[in-house]
Amino acid sequence: METISNIFHNDPLPPLGARANQSIKLRKFIISPYDSRYRTWETFLLVLVVYSAWICPFELAYLRNLSWKVSLVDNIIDSFFAIDIILTFFLAYLDQKSYLLVDDPKRIVARYFSSWFLFDVCSTIPYQLLGQIFKKHENGLAYRLLSMLRLWRLRRLSELFARLEKDIRLNYYWIRCTKLISVTLFAVHCSGCFNYLIADRYPNPARTWIGAAIPNYRSQNLWVRYVTAIYWSITTLTTTGYGDLHAENQREMLFSICYMLFNLGLTAYLIGNMTNLVVQGSCRTRNFRDTIHAASQFAARNQLPGHIKDEMLSHICLRYKTEGLKQKETLDSLPKGIRSSIACNLFLPVIEKVYLFHGVSFTCMIQLVTEMEAEYYPPREVVILQNEAPRDVYILVSGAVEERVEIDGTEKVQEVLCNGEIFGEIGVICSIPQPCAFHTIKVSQLLRLNTAVLKNIIKENSDDRRVILNNLSQKMNQDHRFSTEVMEKSLQMMHQHFGEYNRCSALNQDNEKNELKANNGHSMALEWKRVTIHMYSQRNKRPEAPLAKVINLPGSLDKLFAIACQKFNNYRLTKLVNPEFAEIDDITVIRDGDHLFFMEI
């Protein structure tokens, strides 16, 4: 399990050929930015950054005379960031061009000096301590203004939120809200402190925004003064403006003008981001309601029957519920190899149970699985109509589907299909109108396979084609729901379409088996590999080569040499090579149409 600090970082892209668990080897004394100890150190610094962001404006406005406790805490925090500067000189960095970690000390130092080194040093110098060392103006405004450079550390928080927003383990909505709230609180805190600083530095305390409301405000408790400043800041930011606290002099007026101009941009930023988050959350629901309303109006305008309207609304509701799965969009965005692996993992166990594919090769199974698409259907949904043109084959994964046949104007339920059964295959393979209708009984998940895709796969795999056609023939012979005319027509169309027509009928199973065996033997003969053999002799410089011979490839190399000796009886054959003069020692590597060369040495 990864530690909590791991979510703050993005690991480097591994080079091609690297193993998933390959460790990163760096030079001695060089720190990896992805080391767990360094990540813990960075997480600790983030806590100190939050403290610095709050204390810097507060010290500038309210703490004219720093106590030794506050000064000690500030110096300790500065020392931690000074240590981080030293560590950065030994910290490897990720090259944005090669995406490799650079561990060359010279390059690390050069990069740091040319980037954030000067800013990090200026934000780490203990200016208050320097004032105390010089014994003059130790708590002067100049030193306190220089201490505001510590706000440069906020860039670490900005990088943190940028990483958190990309972390899929965290809720993006709440990360964005946290960021917006943090920006708002920091702006309110800084503006309140700055406005109090202006009033505190004004010569006439009575003519200040806080002095007009609270006479002798400097004698008040620190908490009262801070809350009053924050109250003014938040009412101005939200444009509430009760009027009880307002600018009394030109300095405060100028600051109020600048603050309100800043508020215009900040408010636009906050409202724009929040609106975007809210719209993203409600847009899907609004589109669903609009679709339901449009479908209802369509049904009412065209006076559709109630059951058709219910089917429309059920389909829309199911699509809305399953939209979050986004199966097709997710799979389409992946490479073909990953899609094939996912499809095999999800659908291959289901395909193996289908009677139509019993006995087919694993290669054919893979081809079928990768072309299937998963779909959801609501209850009482019509999947296939009777006598419609065959378009798709469906396999039931979950749910229930009933098979209906209309006889003499009356629709009857013939069978209820369960998980792992296929339907629509008779019309598709036999190229006839669908003999039955299929309706879902409850919410069902189906695998859909296009007609053209299925036929192409069957045609490309001759051995599997015979197995599939044989399985379908046996299924139809065992099924007594179809008439003899329908069965004979289906079998005839099936074999005519795939070029394997036989005269079997559903009424004579013995003749069908004998005919199928004869056809299988004939097909095997047609599928023998044909090769062209040549004679190549090295005994003479310019031999008269005999004509090449086209033969059927036998089952072994010994038989092949025997045939070649008969064809080239005047030569002594010693070796068999391919056109690239690579020796062949296995009959299985020879393909249909290859040119083989027998050598005489």
Curated annotation (Swiss-Prot):
Cellular localization per UniProt: Membrane
Residue ranges annotated for the KHA domain, each copy included: 530-601
Alphabetically ordered keywords of this record: Ion channel, Ion transport, Membrane, Potassium, Potassium channel, Potassium transport, Transmembrane, Transmembrane helix, Transport, Voltage-gated channel
Residues that span the membrane, as ranges: 43-63, 72-92, 113-133, 145-165, 180-200, 252-272
Domain of life according to the entry: Eukaryota
SMART domains referenced in this protein's UniProt entry, alphabetically: cNMP (SM00100)
Ranges of the Cytoplasmic topological domain: 1-42, 93-112, 166-179, 273-601
Positions bound to a nucleoside 3',5'-cyclic phosphate: 356-475
Extracellular topological segments: 64-71, 134-144, 201-227, 248-251
A GO term from the CC aspect: monoatomic ion channel complex
A molecular-function term among this protein's GO annotations: voltage-gated potassium channel activity
Annotated InterPro entries: cNMP-bd_dom, cNMP-bd_dom_sf, Ion_trans_dom, K_chnl_volt-dep_EAG/ELK/ERG, KAT/AKT, KHA_dom, RmlC-like_jellyroll
PROSITE patterns referenced in this protein's UniProt entry, alphabetically: CNMP_BINDING_3, KHA
Matching CDD domains: CAP_ED
Family according to the record: Belongs to the potassium channel family. Plant (TC 1.A.1.4) subfamily.
Function: Probable inward-rectifying potassium channel. Assuming opened or closed conformations in response to the voltage difference across the membrane, the channel is activated by hyperpolarization.
Protein name per the record: Potassium channel KAT2
Organism: Oryza sativa subsp. japonica
